[in-house]
Amino acid sequence: MMESYDVIVIGAGPGGYNAAIRAGQLGLKVACVEGRETLGGTCLNVGCMPSKALLHASELYAAASGGEFARLGIRVSPELDLAQMMKQKDESVAALTRGVEFLFRKHKVQWIKGWARLQGEGRVSVALADGGHAQLEARDIVIATGSEPAPLPGVPVDNQRILDSTGALELAEVPRHLVVIGAGVIGLELSSVWRRLGAQVTVLEYLERICPGLDGETARTLQRALTRQGMRFRLGTRVVAARSGEQGVELDLQPAAGGATESLQADYVLVAIGRRPYTEGLGLETVGLASDRRGMLENQGQRSAAPGVWVIGDVTSGPMLAHKAEEEAIVCIERIAGHAAEMNAEVIPSVIYTQPEVASVGLGEEQLQAARREYKVGRFPFSANSRAKINHESEGFIKILSDARSDQVLGVHMIGPGVSEMIGEACVAMEFSASAEDLALTCHPHPTRSEALRQAAMDVHGRAMQN
């Protein structure tokens, strides 16, 4: 029997579940097909949320184990209970996934547990998790199948000794030596977790810099900070092979520019070279769709080239970020419902949850220089911010880039304490096409770290008062 819906959403990650919930809010009959045992996709289950739980716990452990607590007059002798740390992480994740289930019930979203395959225009077949099959039809179908860890030739992931990001969140012991392949966001965040818990960490990167998409000045500052924390970086390095055994892994390395092979030993290796869109077995050919050379599905305003098929999140162009997928989900469903909706792709923030944190939105200096666009720069260091200094968290800075003529804010780059919670103000400013002067004229509470943003805006015009 064919079950009919207004909208079928394939995938229940941040893009998929938000699309389904919004469709339900708008009164559409909606089904969400997800084969995982729990809702939330990679982000809630094996990505954003569990990694943040471990980052928070490991940061507290490192503060208690090192000199930070003693400096404040707090003397403790902490003992690591890794099993309990993992348990609280799992409990937090479970609570979040149950929350999505509640929202599905609240907004009358039908969760069909299984794996979807397109069967031509407006039709979807589902291999149900319980072994059966279901046939569905809808006027509109939203593909939100997300992404998976990208493989590295010659380095086979077994999640015993050679790990992907999921495996690195589940280790039952602290590695003696963890080698991380890839100095991007995922690699650096998970490196931070295990370094804080006592592992020796070596980060290998093919390029000559960390975090290729990050503003260069910010990336260099972050690398220096992580190096002081004990991480070792080997840039311009290519991994050509890996052999794992019961006791560890042997890696064969070469200079990226070419040269002699050398060996490196580790007891665990994390492969974190990025992610790729996941569309395997989706039946794209039945609706005339094909992915591009990057594996992504093209879209115009979230519409694919196939009638009635929409794409959001990691399977389409743009940064692979949960909040970007959520934004696309809202735009997609509003358009399906016949409403006007737009997304400003220039105002999608990015955050790295290391210590110090990194956050940015908009264009960087390298991009502006490549475009031959004239711009002004305002900087303010956290070492001159009163709240950061009294908290002994004065590493980093805020940098604002504005148009040389109009003063419109073009990009904001932050590295320092709590900047993940501050970048939102910059996003609002850019969404409203604010100038640096607009930020400079806005009163900020004292003493707060957010004052550094105002001072950076003042510095665009040479008027910073506290540095």
Q: Which stretches of residues belong to each language-model region?
A:
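Beta1/beta-strand and adjacent pyrophosphate-binding region of the FAD-binding site
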Residues: 2-13, 174-184
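Short hydrophobic core segments
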Residues: 8-10, 116, 135-146, 180-181, ...
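N-terminal Rossmann-fold NAD(P) dinucleotide-binding loop
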Residues: 16, 187-188
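A structured beta-alpha segment of the ubiquitous adenosine-cofactor-binding alpha/beta core
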Residues: 127-134, 239-240, 252-263, 275
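Flexible, glycine-rich terminal cap/loop adjacent to redox cofactors
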Residues: 10-15, 19-36, 42, 49, ...
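Gly/Ala-rich phosphate-binding loop of Rossmann-like dinucleotide-binding domains
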Residues: 20, 24, 191, 195-196
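FAD-site-proximal beta/loop scaffold in flavoenzymes
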Residues: 158-174, 263-335
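Glycine-rich flavin
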Residues: 2-5, 21-174, 202, 207-211, ...
